[in-house]
C-alpha cells in the first residue's frame, strides 16, 4: 500500500506572526503561574493549595517550552507580551478577584479554556510541515491545560451546590467572557471558532495585528501582609509556646506518638513553603527566569509534600489533622527582599530539616514506625537537598559580599526570634548560626535542630 501524506504546505502564520502569538501565549501562561501562586496563601483548602502547586509548575514548564520555540523562531527567548493593554487589564482584573470561586471560574472556565482553544486553532492553522515543532508543542500544552480545566470544573461543581451559587458563578463567567471577547482574546485578533466544522476559512483574510507599541500595559502583583496563611478548619495557629508543648509534648521520642507529633508539625512547614514559593513567583517577576522556574519546581515539591505528610499523619500514624497548633512564622514572607525570604527558610531551616529527616529515618528503621516512614523520610530529604542548593546558588550569584553579610545579620535575628519561641528564657542566641551560602558552606553541625519545619 502506498503511503499517503495528506499534509499540504502553507499556513496562516508567517515566522514573525508565529513568534508574536507564542509570545502572547507565554504571557498568559506566566500570568496563570503568578495568579495561582499568589492566591495560594489566601486559599484555605489544603487540597486546593496542593493542586495549585502542581498547576503552577505546569504553567512554568509551559512558559519555558514556549521560550525554547521562540528562540528557534529567531525571537527573544524570554519574550512574553500581552497582545494589547485591554488584555493586560483583564488579567489584572482577574488577579484582584477576592473569592476562591470567582478565581477558579476565571482560570478554569474562562482563561484556560480560551488558551486551549487557541492552541488547537494555531496547531491546525499553521504550516503542518514547515512548522511541525510548533504543532507538536501546542498539542502538548493543550493537553496539560485541558487536565487543569477538568479539575477546576469538578471543584467548582462541589463548591456551587446551591442554585444561587451556580447562578453567581455563571454571572462571573459571563462577565469575564465578555471582557475577553472585547479585548480580542490572548492574541488580540478575536476568538477563533475553529470548532465549527462547517465553517470554511479558505476565503477569509489572515487576521490583522495591531502594533501595541511600547505603551502596552504592565502591572505588578502585590499581596497584602498577613499574620499567617489562610487554612481551613481544623487547622489553627498559636503564638503561645505552652499550647505547642501541651499538644505535642516537650520530648518527642521515636514512638508512634512522637512520630505523629513530628509529622503534624512538619505539615505546617510544607503548607507554608508551598504558599511562600507561590507568593514569591507572584511578587518578584524581575527575578531571573531560570530562578523562577526552580521556585515553581520547589512549589510543586512542597505541594506533593503536603499530600505525603498529611497522608502519613492520618493513615500511617493514626492521627487526626488539626490536633495541634501551627506556628506564626509568616512575617518573613512579607519582606520586600526576596533573598531574605530564602535566607532563613531555604539556607537554614531546610538544611536543618535534611538532618532531622536523616535522624528520623534511622530511628524509624529501628523502632515501631517501620520502613514506610523511613522510606518517606528519605524521599523528602532528597527534595530538601535540591531546595537548599537552589537558594544557595542563587544568593551567591545575585548578592555581592556586602549584601551576603547583611543577609547573615538579618537571618540571625530571624533565627533568634524563631528558636527563642521554643527555648524560652534559656535561649542563648543565634550569633553562631550559619547559612549555606556562606563561603565555609554554612556548616554548624554542633547546633542541634530545635525547630521542625522549613
PLM regions with names:
Residues 2-454:
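Non-heme di-metal
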Amino acid at each position: 500500500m502506498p503511503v499517503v501524506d495528506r499534509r499540504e504546505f502553507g499556513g496562516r502564520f508567517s515566522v514573525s506572526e508565529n513568534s508574536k502569538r507564542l509570545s502572547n501565549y507565554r504571557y498568559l501562561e506566566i500570568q496563570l503561574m503568578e495568579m495561582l501562586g499568589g492566591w495560594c496563601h489566601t486559599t484555605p483548602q489544603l487540597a486546593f493549595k496542593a493542586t495549585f502547586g502542581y498547576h503552577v509548575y505546569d504553567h512554568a514548564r509551559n512558559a519555558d517550552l514556549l521560550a525554547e520555540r521562540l528562540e528557534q523562531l529567531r525571537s527573544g527567548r524570554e519574550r512574553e507580551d500581552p497582545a494589547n493593554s485591554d488584555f493586560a487589564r483583564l488579567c489584572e482584573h482577574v488577579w484582584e478577584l477576592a473569592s476562591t470561586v470567582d478565581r477558579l471560574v476565571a482560570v478554569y472556565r474562562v482563561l484556560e479554556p480560551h488558551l486551549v482553544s487557541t492552541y488547537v486553532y494555531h496547531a491546525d492553522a499553521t504550516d503542518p510541515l514547515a512548522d511541525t515543532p510548533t504543532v507538536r508543542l501546542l498539542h502538548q500544552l493543550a493537553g496539560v491545560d485541558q487536565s487543569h480545566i477538568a479539575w477546576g470544573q469538578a471543584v467548582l461543581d462541589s463548591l456551587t451546590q446551591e442554585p444561587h451559587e451556580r447562578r453567581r458563578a455563571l454571572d462571573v463567567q459571563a462577565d469575564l467572557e465578555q471582557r475577553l471577547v472585547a479585548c480580542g482574546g490572548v492574541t488580540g485578533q478575536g476568538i477563533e471558532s475553529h470548532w465549527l466544522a462547517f465553517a470554511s476559512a479558505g476565503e477569509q483574510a489572515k487576521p490583522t495585528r495591531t502594533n501595541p507599541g511600547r505603551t502596552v500595559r504592565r502591572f505588578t502583583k502585590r499581596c497584602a501582609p498577613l499574620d499567617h496563611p489562610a487554612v481551613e478548619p481544623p487547622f489553627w495557629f498559636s503564638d503561645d509556646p505552652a499550647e505547642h508543648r501541651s499538644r505535642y509534648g516537650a520530648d518527642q521520642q521515636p514512638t508512634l506518638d512522637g512520630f505523629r507529633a513530628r509529622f503534624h508539625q512538619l505539615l505546617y512547614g510544607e503548607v507554608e513553603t508551598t504558599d511562600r514559593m507561590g507568593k514569591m513567583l507572584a511578587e518578584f517577576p524581575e527575578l531571573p527566569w531560570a530562578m523562577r522556574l526552580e521556585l515553581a519546581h520547589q512549589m510543586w515539591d512542597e505541594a506533593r509534600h503536603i499530600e505525603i505528610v498529611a497522608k502519613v499523619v492520618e493513615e500511617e500514624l493514626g492521627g487526626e489533622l488539626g490536633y495541634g497548633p501551627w506556628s506564626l512564622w509568616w512575617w518573613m514572607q512579607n519582606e520586600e527582599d526576596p533573598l531574605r525570604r530564602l535566607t532563613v527558610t531555604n539556607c537554614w531551616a531546610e538544611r536543618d530539616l535534611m538532618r532531622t529527616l536523616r535522624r528520623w529515618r534511622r530511628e524509624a528503621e529501628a523502632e515501631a514506625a517501620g520502613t514506610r516512614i523511613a522510606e518517606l523520610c528519605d524521599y523528602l530529604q532528597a527534595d530538601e537537598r535540591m531546595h537548599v542548593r537552589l537558594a544557595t546558588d542563587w544568593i551567591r550569584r545575585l548578592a555581592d559580599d556586602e549584601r551576603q553579610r547583611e543577609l547573615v545579620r538579618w537571618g540571625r535575628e530571624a533565627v533568634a526570634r524563631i528558636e527563642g519561641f521554643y527555648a524560652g528564657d534559656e535561649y542563648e542566641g543565634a550569633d553562631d548560626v550559619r547559612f549555606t551560602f556562606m563561603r565555609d558552606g554554612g556548616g554548624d553541625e554542633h547546633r542541634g535542630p530545635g525547630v521542625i519545619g522549613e
